[in-house]
């Protein structure tokens, strides 16, 4: 059997608060790598504390890519990510370094590693109509309407996931075809890499829940509310009719802080809601990760030496 001459890449996935960022840096330092963020919120400038964005020292220790590349009032799609990540990978490989892709945004990983079907681009007018509909009738109602025209996609989307409900309805209303129908088309070219997939996740869920609660408290202590207030008073965001519909402002933690600043609930309720929303995000991420059948799972607190051995063996193949 001929040797696989494709460039190697490490894919490090996991739920939020599992310790991926530091492990990615450790791997990069040991094996001459560069980190590519696979996170739909880290792309935004100004969202630092609430995203646990790698700090300046971490980013100076090894090169990082696709962090702070757009403004929080802009949109950034999975297709945008796949394009930019391919460019970053090409650059890293040309330098003779190891691409290390790390994050928790499953759609971004799928877009890059498996490819995307061609679909209609975003349509601002249709999107605004859907948003107005949701404000009037609720996202749960729109989820029901989606099920009437695209039962397959609706079954994959939770009724509390407005961004995906909106996109699925937008695709249908723009094209007259369901998203599931579009997804039956041949995928765009897959990434020509030899990939090792690792999942970093605590073995016991209560450990992850503890880490989530501890981290959200630290975010609040470190100034998350001030960060959100700076975002909401920025002229480009403040001038918007519905700023909370921005993908950046729908991010876990940011929406809850915004609502607290609007006096919708107390500081204690903010903490409780922020932790609950983060736990729900982690649950969705774990559901997706269980479908990654070719990934190897590791516990962040006990498996450091095992991870090193697996990476070493993969790179020496």
Swiss-Prot record:
Q: Which organism is it from?
A: Xylella fastidiosa (strain 9a5c)
The entry's protein name is: tRNA dimethylallyltransferase
- Residues annotated as binding ATP are 14-21
User: What's a Pfam family in this record?
Assistant: IPPT
The family annotation for this protein states: Belongs to the IPP transferase family.
Summarize where substrate binds, as residue positions: 16-21
* Domain of life assignment: Bacteria
The portions of this protein that span the membrane are none
The record's annotation in NCBIfam families points to:
miaA
Q: Which cofactor does it need?
A: Mg(2+)
Question: What gene makes this protein?
Answer: miaA
